């Protein structure tokens, strides 16, 4: 029994109860550049690694604004991601026109999941080969959802998708319990650190990552979804590197002091 007997059509089940075309779409998400999302009670942050197809080309956008209160980061087929981000933008505009209020983030993620699920039940369609991290703010606070090509969606405190995302997940799993009380600056630093884990030795700079944030200030005013300026990102990266180098410098200076003490010791009497 060969798999190719059951993977030519998205509506054909295998004897093991699997839809291979849907699984292939989920594998496409793992081939895209890494994206990270994390949230506190009041803010949500999205970060993405910028990967160019070749040295001669520029990178494609991975983070998109959907509305003032929400945005997405995507991994997989960027063209599919652009289509879905336009769909989400249209849903937010229609809801705001009818109800004069922003679309809750949970319903935004649900509508995206419903659209993806339809493609798993139509023989003339294919699943979207992209995974989306949906971050936003509503009356109940900040939210982060992951929407899968299968039509499933899950809410997370922190999550990572894309190539080598397991390294970022491991980093986030060690720290996510304190994220509810994090400041926006701390969230951005952890998002950048998680992206750095996926770069496999490549130096993290403001040119190879994108960061966006949305949240609510202490006085209750909403900070709209916005891309963080490249200059500010570089300043944060520089401060992170300085903080990492400080303990090493202290350890080196203390070891040198111990060596100096050893050379100044009086010789033993014979």
UniProtKB/Swiss-Prot annotation:
Its main location: cytoplasm. InterPro entries: Ntn_hydrolases_N, Proteasome_alpha, Proteasome_alpha-type, Proteasome_alpha1, Proteasome_asu_N, Proteasome_sua/b. One of its GO terms (cellular component) is nucleus. One of its GO terms (biological process) is proteasome-mediated ubiquitin-dependent protein catabolic process. Residues 239-270 are annotated as: Disordered. Belongs to the peptidase T1A family. Gene3D superfamilies: Glutamine Phosphoribosylpyrophosphate, subunit 1, domain 1 (3.60.20.10). This is Proteasome subunit alpha type-1. Signal peptide: none annotated. The keyword Transcription does not apply. It is found in: Cytoplasm; Nucleus. SUPFAM superfamilies: N-terminal nucleophile aminohydrolases (Ntn hydrolases). The 26S proteasome consists of a 20S proteasome core and two 19S regulatory subunits. The 20S proteasome core is composed of 28 subunits that are arranged in four stacked rings, resulting in a barrel-shaped structure. The two end rings are each formed by seven alpha subunits, and the two central rings are each formed by seven beta subunits. The catalytic chamber with the active sites is on the inside of the barrel. It comes from Oryza sativa subsp. japonica (Rice). Residues 245-256 have a biased composition (Low complexity). The proteasome is a multicatalytic proteinase complex which is characterized by its ability to cleave peptides with Arg, Phe, Tyr, Leu, and Glu adjacent to the leaving group at neutral or slightly basic pH. The proteasome has an ATP-dependent proteolytic activity. The keyword Nucleus applies. The gene is PAF1.
């Amino acid at each position: 029994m060969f798999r190719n007997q059951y993977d030519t059509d998205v509506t054909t089940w295998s004897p093991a109860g699997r839809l291979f075309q849907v699984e292939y779409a989920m594998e496409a998400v793992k081939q895209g550049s890494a994206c990270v999302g994390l949230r506190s009670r009041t803010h949500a942050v999205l970060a993405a690694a910028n990967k160019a197809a070749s040295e001669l080309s520029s990178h494609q956008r991975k983070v998109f604004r959907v509305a003032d209160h929400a945005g997405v980061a995507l991994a997989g087929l960027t063209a599919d991601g652009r289509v879905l981000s336009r769909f989400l933008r249209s849903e937010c505009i229609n809801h705001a026109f009818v109800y004069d209020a922003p679309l809750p983030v949970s319903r935004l993620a649900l509508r995206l999941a419903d659209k993806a699920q339809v493609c798993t039940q139509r023989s003339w369609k294919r699943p979207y080969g992209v995974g989306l991290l949906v971050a936003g703010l509503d009356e109940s606070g900040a939210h982060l959802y992951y929407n899968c090509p299968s039509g499933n969606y899950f809410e997370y405190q922190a999550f990572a998708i894309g190539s080598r995302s397991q390294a970022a997940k491991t980093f986030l799993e060690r720290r996510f319990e304190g994220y509810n009380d994090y400041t926006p600056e701390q969230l951005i630093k952890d998002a950048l650190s998680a992206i750095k884990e996926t770069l496999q030795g490549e130096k993290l700079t403001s040119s190879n990552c994108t960061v966006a944030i949305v949240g609510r200030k202490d006085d209750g005013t909403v900070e709209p979804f916005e891309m963080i300026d490249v200059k500010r990102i570089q300043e944060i990266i520089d401060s992170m590197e300085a903080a990492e180098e400080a303990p090493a410098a202290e350890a080196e200076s203390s070891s040198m002091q111990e060596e100096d003490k050893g050379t100044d010791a009086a010789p033993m009497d014979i």
